[in-house]
Amino acid sequence: MHFASDRITIIQVRQVHPRSGCPVSISLELLGDRWSLLIVRDLMVRGYQTYKEFLLSGEGIATNILADRLQKLEAAGIIMAEGAGDDGRRIHYRLTEKGIGLAPVVLELLLWAARHESTSAPCGLIDHLAGNREAVLAETWRRWRNRDLTPLIPPFRDQAAN
């Protein structure tokens, strides 16, 4: 279990030190691992907000990796953790303004993969997203501002192995 007071010390020592001033290099320092953008996707598109929801998202992230990535994303200012419940011990994560700024990146990665790789995303969904980029991004921002956690994209079978 993670507590807000425990994270403060950990986060302070995990600052990103870019290898260069290149914007792509800096972006990859923050988001270039296998899991970070999937966590951002789950917050943004699926409305997930708890540790347990991320664990059950289907990609099979290990608990130690998830904890590490959540800490790194929080330290980078991409997500924030808030205490929830009567005692504040349960943590809910949400995107910051910096994090929701990744919406175009997530959308374009989804569309790129659908164009160039075999995915389980329905063709109709891909066509809708591709033809309505601006509206989809506007809706993403609206939901973020209103803390609307309903899934942006309807659930579909997203596990190729299942």
Question: Which residue ranges define each predicted feature?
Answer:
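N-terminal helix-turn-helix DNA-binding core of bacterial DNA-binding proteins
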Residues: 22-62
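N-terminal leader segment of winged-helix/HTH proteins
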Residues: 1-31
